[in-house]
Amino acid sequence: MEHFDASLSTYFKALLGPRDTRVKGWFLLDNYIPTFICSVIYLLIVWLGPKYMRNKQPFSCRGILVVYNLGLTLLSLYMFCELVTGVWEGKYNFFCQGTRTAGESDMKIIRVLRWYYFSKLIEFMDTFFFILRKNNHQITVLHVYHHASMLNIWWFVMNWVPCGHSYFGATLNSFIHVLMYSYYGLSSVPSMRPYLWWKKYITQGQLLQFVLTIIQTSCGVIWPCTFPLGWLYFQIGYMISLIALFTNFYIQTYNKKGASRRKDHLKDHQNGSVAAVNGHTNSFSPLENNVKPRKLRKD
């Protein structure tokens, strides 16, 4: 294993240049193998988990979901505040910022982005909760691609460009995650669901985040500094892939749902009655044909 790791490190050095020594010896960042193994295990659980749960009752997970989402909300808020203050103290340049120009402020950014990398590992739990609750329709190509790729990308970011221009996307993403995980935490409490109206706008915020990241990254290409250009081109390409997938998700989830509701509403009027829609707006499906809802485990 050590020989393989040494060979891998030599290959990465030839491809990407020398690593940033400021993260040398840091947990999970010294070599790529643990991150790769975690990603493989994640993909195996995505594949095998639904098969294992097929003939089992779904778990509720309500209590642990509240704690989990609250924890990620607070972690995201901490990272956002620390990144903003670090950028302010280091007088970071919006258009392009190198990785060795702000002294101690760079180290502050690096320490926060280490937590950002760890948060991508923690967020694998999003998928595991979907599996345990048998919400398999939420395990989409977008969901798996985003979760699996972010952990791996940020291992490389932390080893080669752990500060400087790398801060912007992580700062925006941390802010979006404050909104997103607070929403998911509140939605875990049934009595709160009727008051949660902003899920649609979270997706819009995510799309705006990607567009702003492309704009800010492009500034580093147009007005270059000491930050490696190859990383900027890669980030632009990755953001484009996320925009394509999130736009498709948005259209499939909201535009088609709205068109379907308008069609059903018109049909109900033509039949001389209007159906109640509270079951849908409150995130519950109405019962039809006297079919009882399946029981959830209270684990």
Swiss-Prot record:
One example of a Gene Ontology biological process annotation: sphingolipid biosynthetic process
Q: Where are the N-acetylmethionine residues found in this chain?
A: 1
Instruction: Just give the chief location class.
Output: endoplasmic reticulum
Q: Where is this region: Disordered?
A: 275-299
Q: Could you say which EC number(s) this protein's record lists? A: 2.3.1.199
User: Superkingdom of the source?
Assistant: Eukaryota
Q: Which reaction does it catalyse?
A: a very-long-chain acyl-CoA + malonyl-CoA + H(+) = a very-long-chain 3-oxoacyl-CoA + CO2 + CoA; (6Z,9Z,12Z)-octadecatrienoyl-CoA + malonyl-CoA + H(+) = (8Z,11Z,14Z)-3-oxoeicosatrienoyl-CoA + CO2 + CoA; (9Z,12Z,15Z)-octadecatrienoyl-CoA + malonyl-CoA + H(+) = (11Z,14Z,17Z)-3-oxoeicosatrienoyl-CoA + CO2 + CoA; (9Z)-hexadecenoyl-CoA + malonyl-CoA + H(+) = 3-oxo-(11Z)-octadecenoyl-CoA + CO2 + CoA
Q: How does it assemble?
A: Interacts with TECR.
Family per UniProt?
Belongs to the ELO family. ELOVL5 subfamily.
Q: What is this protein called?
A: Very long chain fatty acid elongase 5
| Naturally occurring in which organism (per UniProt) | Macaca fascicularis (Crab-eating macaque)
- Lineage of the species this protein comes from: Eukaryota, Metazoa, Chordata, Craniata, Vertebrata
Q: Which gene name belongs to this protein?
A: ELOVL5
